[in-house]
């Protein structure tokens, strides 16, 4: 089986590349990074990516799209750029698949941001979508494009709604933010009340979930929650990080809500479990691994 990973130099993409390589899959990476040369890597233009050449030249069984923008604040500042990277780019990939490799399975990394503030917890895949940002809207639109290409062109597609991803190599979001503030601030201030909650999933569990999707999903344009079905408050995980980081500084919450941030998330992962998913990395183990990685930098 030959897998093309678009965005192979990003956080999830790099982990997925290494994971499938370790299992002796034939893996081809694709990204905009210019200072890397390898026989299994294709550099694409950051401003005008052309996927037709790739799919015309290579026989691909599975295309995993890990590319795109992943910042709610930046999507608010520059919505067209976010749309181009998260929606238009998906259409361009699928159009190339339709033209040259119509039997190729296509997986797109979507986001729990499509849900916004859900009406009930846990969140099922058929919940009403209330995205709170251009980022969430553009991810939702990309999901519709996957449905379009399956319905009208019989392309095998599947959208993965990633919840709160974390793990070694991620230099942004909550745990990296905490690390930077522990280094540079006397008092640690975080947005919100601390009662906001997320469903965290370690990147190692994300890539094993992707593998299960490749093996067992229907690929009929469906969406699948990628999470652990566990709800943790930001206060509790920040304190867990604090404890494991062995730092005496105090954490306070400023009660300010960042635009585009949801309040509470917990996923229903019945669909993912039916594919064979079992969590391997607990939040405690994952945070300790992250701290070990930070300390080795």
Language-model features: locations:
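N-terminal Rossmann NAD(P)H-binding glycine-rich loop of SDR-like oxidoreductase domains
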Residues: 3-22
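Rossmann-fold cofactor-recognition segment
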Residues: 36-48
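NAD(P)H-binding glycine-rich loop region in Rossmannoid oxidoreductase-like domains
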Residues: 50-85
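Catalytic helix-loop patch of NAD(P)-dependent Rossmann-fold dehydrogenases
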Residues: 77-92, 114-159, 170-171
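Glycine/proline-rich active-site loop of Rossmann-fold NAD(P)-dependent oxidoreductases
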Residues: 140, 155-156, 165-177, 186, ...
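C-terminal "lid/loop" region of Rossmann-like NAD(P)-dependent oxidoreductases
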Residues: 193, 221-224, 232-239, 246-264, ...
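Conserved C-terminal active-site "lid" loop/helix of NAD(P)H-dependent oxidoreductases
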Residues: 203, 257-285, 289
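Non-catalytic, hydrophobic alpha-helical segments
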Residues: 206, 210, 226, 237, ...
């Amino acid at each position: 089986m030959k897998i093309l990973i678009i965005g192979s130099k990003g956080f999830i993409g790099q982990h997925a590349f290494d994971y499938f390589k370790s299992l002796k899959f034939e893996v081809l990476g694709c990204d905009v990074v210019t200072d890397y040369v390898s026989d299994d890597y294709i550099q694409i233009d950051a401003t005008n990516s052309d996927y037709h050449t790739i799919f015309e030249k290579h026989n691909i069984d599975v295309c995993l799209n890990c590319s795109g923008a992943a910042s709610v604040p930046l999507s608010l500042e520059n919505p067209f750029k976010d749309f181009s990277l998260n929606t238009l780019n998906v259409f361009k990939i699928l159009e190339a698949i339709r033209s040259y490799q119509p039997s190729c399975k296509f997986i797109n990394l979507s986001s729990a941001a499509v849900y916004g503030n859900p009406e009930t917890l846990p969140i099922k895949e058929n919940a009403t979508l209330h995205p709170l940002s251009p980022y969430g809207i553009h991810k939702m639109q990309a999901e519709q494009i996957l449905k379009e290409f399956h319905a009208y062109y019989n392309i095998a597609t599947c959208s993965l709604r990633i919840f709160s991803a974390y793990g070694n190599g991620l230099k942004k979001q909550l745990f990296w933010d905490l690390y930077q503030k522990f280094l540079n601030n006397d008092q640690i201030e975080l947005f919100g009340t601390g009662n906001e909650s997320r469903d965290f999933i370690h990147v190692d569990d994300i890539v094993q979930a992707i593998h299960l999707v490749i093996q067992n999903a229907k690929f009929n344009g469906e969406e699948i929650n990628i999470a652990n079905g566990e709800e943790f408050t930001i206060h509790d995980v920040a304190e867990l990080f604090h404890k494991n980081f062995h730092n005496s500084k105090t954490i306070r919450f400023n009660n300010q809500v960042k635009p585009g941030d949801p309040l509470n998330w917990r996923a229903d992962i019945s669909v993912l479990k039916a594919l064979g998913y079992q969590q391997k990395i607990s939040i405690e183990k994952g945070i300790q691994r992250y701290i070990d990685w930070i300390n080795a930098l």
